Amino acid sequence: MKANAFGKVAVMLGGTSAERDVSLKSGMAVLKGLVAKGIDAHAFDPAAHSLQELVEQKFDRVFIALHGRGGEDGSMQGALQILEMPYTGSDVLGCALGMDKVRCKQIWHSVGLPTANWRVVTQAEIEQVNVEAMLQELGGRVIVKPAREGSSIGMSIADNGRSLALALQHAAEFDDDLLVEQWVEGAEYTIGILEGKALPVIRLQTPHEFYDFEAKYQANDTQYHCPAGLSDDDEASLRTLAERAFAAIGGSGWGRIDVMRNNAGEWFLLEANTVPGMTEKSLVPMAAKVAGLQFNDLVERILAQTLER
């Protein structure tokens, strides 16, 4: 595909969410890749520029590299649709559902896809929660998550009443709705999605209790295994599960699905990511490379999806 077919491209990065720093790194990597392909691409931080400038400066399309609220939750996608500006990734509905961990799990559960047991606590309900009863109901060990944050921000593990109360208070600093999810003991996997098809599975190995913010972006002791060491049948079934999970929430274009496998060999869907990280430590580029797709070609493929909008 000729580079001039894309016209003038805005790489949207930064923003105002708690994931701003990660977004800046993702966006700059994407920008570098697009420019290397000869594409007329420019950085655009919506925290510093009005969206009207996209029209005034005659941009033709947008590569969204915003993570978290305001960029991955459907609001930016809706604004760009009003401007009739083609953009990468899922639409308003897919992004909104993917960002909301509670709604995402409700949909997966409703269509028969496997996900760990959970309960929802609102910020207003924290003081009334019977933490001991909730722990017992969910198997004695849980992970608490803000419903609408990414990069593992605000997450913590609890295995007694005091730690659950503290975990709820911590998560409430980031969201009014909190997900209390049964802890799944086992290995964590992630599956990139590109054009509706799963990329090679990656198995994550970290000495941390879980794949938290530090393990994702700061630690040097996190190991990534791709190929993941699964049998051919397990690799195929996990890829199919990821494709179904992404489609169930209305995801499109590209994304990532995170999964746990318990010690009995059962799969449990964790989360959907509709604008995954694109930093030097990010997982979708890693899987794409194993599939034979170099980073610059990957970002061009993702951008090419906007030509169909």
Swiss-Prot record:
GO cellular component: cytosol
Role: Cell wall formation.
An example Gene Ontology molecular-function term: ATP binding
Binding residues annotated for ATP, in chain numbering: 135-190
HAMAP family: Dala_Dala_lig
Record pathway: Cell wall biogenesis; peptidoglycan biosynthesis
Compartments in which it is found: Cytoplasm
Protein name: D-alanine--D-alanine ligase
ATP-grasp domain span: 105-304
E.C. numbers: 6.3.2.4
InterPro entries linked: ATP-grasp, ATP_grasp_subdomain_1, D-Ala_lig_Van_CS, D_ala_D_ala, Dala_Dala_lig_C, Dala_Dala_lig_N, PreATP-grasp_dom_sf
Catalytic class of the enzyme: ligase
Species per Swiss-Prot/TrEMBL record: Idiomarina loihiensis (strain ATCC BAA-735 / DSM 15497 / L2-TR)
Gene: ddl
Residues the entry annotates as binding Mg(2+) 1: D258, E271
Magnesium found in the keyword field: yes
